Amino acid sequence: MNGKSEKVHGKSMLSKVMIPMLILGILEVAVFAIVMLVSGELTYIKKYSYNLLIEKTANRASYVEYMLNQKTSPVYETAVEINHITEEYLDENGITLDQLSEDKEVNKELLIRSSDALVSLIRRDMVNDAFIILDTGSLYDTDTDTVRAGLYLRDTDAYENSTTDIKDIYMEMGSSDIAHELGTALDSEWAPHLVINDDNDFSFYTVPMESKELYPDKPVYNLGYWSGFSKISPSAQKSMKYTFPLVSSDGRVYGVVGIGLMEKTILKNIPANDFFNESACYIISSDIEGDGIYTPELHSGPIYTRLVSADTVFDENADNSYGIYELRQGTKAHPSAAYSE
């Protein structure tokens, strides 16, 4: 009987101690919350968190832009080299650029002479693709397609280059005779020529070809063009391309030279583990129409597929808080997703 009384008495003492402490703790939390709300501290904390996110994304964007800009100068240098090769070849044979649209052997020889410059461009610029596309007029055209002669080389791993040979480089597009001459293998997605149609985006070729005429007062080295991810054939892997017009000494544009970066290469520069949880990712997008509506080109992080659908709109005119924009699903704002430019 005494033991039972002691147990009840013990419980009573514990309750007398714990209940006031619990009430005191709740009061402290309530007072703290009220102080935070009244003083505006929550707003400052939210703003600080947003600023951290904006700073992180801005730093990463600057890094990616710097990386891409670093890869443009070698393209211009290669264009100058190929222009010299072309002029030298034309002078040797007493012909003009008109032969590009009349003689397939002229195209082949010019591409063979330029092939070493493309291999060098892949190596020193650490890119996946290097290519030349010539303006061959209607020489290769079919009844349904516009066709151009060219040479397109690809190294699927831009950061591991062979120092002794070019066995790690494959030909994506070009004459098989050139592949034999160069000593490189044909890729499984190989095509002999570039077929230009509505199935893929070929702005990497068409825009630089028109740039000299559209911007006659611009220096040639300012006519380079970054395009989005595109394929050179229906089965080829996509790459983001930078192209530069090939311009003769008399100002005639006779083709383009360019580089390409595959998705996996760029993803190495936008790692999802920059963030400490799985509720964020990086997105590279483009404003194609110049209207503030961005089209996603590439993303990192698994959260993307859960937040973004075909109806999602990236609009710089959308509601934002401290530079963080809400995603819109069609005309409605997404309640649980946001992005920073």
What are these regions (language model features)?
Residues 112-142, 284-311:
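Extracytoplasmic ligand-binding sensor domains of the Cache superfamily
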Residues 104-117, 201-208:
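Well-ordered, non-membrane alpha-helical segments in soluble/globular domains
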Residues 83, 116-125, 234, 271-277:
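Short regulatory alpha-helical segment in sensory/regulatory domains of signaling proteins that mediates
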Residues 1-10:
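N-terminal Lys/Arg-rich, disordered targeting/topogenic segments
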Residues 170-258:
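Extracytoplasmic/periplasmic ligand-binding sensor regions of membrane-associated signaling proteins
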Residues 151-210, 299, 309-331:
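Low-complexity, serine/threonine/proline-enriched polar segments
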Residues 264-341:
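Intrinsic low-complexity, intrinsically disordered coil/linker regions enriched in small/polar
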Residues 9-109, 126-128:
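Juxtamembrane extracytoplasmic/periplasmic/luminal helical "stalk" adjacent to the first N-terminal
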